[in-house]
Amino acid sequence: MTTPPERPETSVDRKLLEILVCPVTKGPLEFDAARQELISRGAKLAYPIRDGIPIMLPEEARKLG
């Protein structure tokens, strides 16, 4: 039996992270490499990164507890 390939962790370019803001609060975002998400602490949302592309749509974001 073979194990499925692990999802390669990607990083977000620092300059891109400086430019991107939360579309809800216009506040800063933090990169969570393990979950491949951009976190908005102000909005309590986690925006997914799919195939290296941040999905900055509030309806696609995961709500944080």
UniProtKB/Swiss-Prot annotation:
Gene3D superfamilies per UniProt: 2.20.25.10
Record-linked InterPro entries: Trm112-like
UniProt-listed Pfam families: Trm112p
Annotated SUPFAM superfamilies: Trm112p-like (SSF158997)
GO cellular component: cytosol
Family note: Belongs to the UPF0434 family.
Name of this chain's protein: UPF0434 protein RPB_0294
Organism encoding this protein: Rhodopseudomonas palustris (strain HaA2)
